[in-house]
Regions:
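RNase H-like, metal-dependent nuclease domains and their acidic two-metal-ion catalytic environment used
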Residues: 1-27, 31-33, 38-159
Length: 159
């Protein structure tokens, strides 16, 4: 028979809470309009998970720019690279460059314009950019041997 592996799927809830809310955010190269002299934690920095993940992607791209163009050193897992062979690379780049950030929130937190707001302004949904952004979300990885048990069809729980 075929030996399979079960994979835990974790849905992305962009409007949900930020990851590691009490960890201090490192504002490397930030052009954020807030007080960059004051340390802020993730909960103070971002309105939701979507904003946090887009900002993490922005930071990763900025670090890559600093590494490639300015000679700065960063760990490889803090950088990003896209294959030049991606057929929709120009479209992906366009989407990533036009993610609108909101500046009018009183909290001073990073906020990304919602999809309904983008639609009202005639901005197409950034589906490719969203896919790359979602990869920034922290997911706990664990291993479990499922070969000895299987889900109960009646309850959906593991026996």
């Amino acid at each position: 028979g075929v030996k399979g592996k079960r994979i835990k799927l974790v849905p992305f809830h962009g409007g949900g809470a930020v990851d590691s809310p009490f960890d201090v955010y490192d504002e490397i190269g930030s052009d954020f309009a807030g007080d960059i002299d004051k340390e802020r934690n993730n909960a103070e920095m971002f309105t939701n998970a979507r904003a946090q993940c887009y900002w993490m992607l922005r930071d990763r791209m900025f670090k890559t720019y600093l590494a490639v163009d300015k000679g700065h050193n960063f760990p490889n897992d803090e950088l990003i690279s896209f294959s030049s062979g991606i057929s929709e690379l120009a479209g992906l780049r366009a989407e990533l460059c036009r993610i609108p950030r909101k500046y009018n929130n009183a909290s001073g937190k990073v906020q990304i314009m919602s999809k309904p707001e983008m639609k009202k302004l005639g901005i197409q949904s950034p589906n490719m950019a969203d896919a790359v952004m979602m990869l920034q979300k922290h997911v706990d990885i664990y291993e479990h041997d499922y070969t000895d048990n299987s889900p109960s069809r009646a309850t959906g729980n593991w026996a």
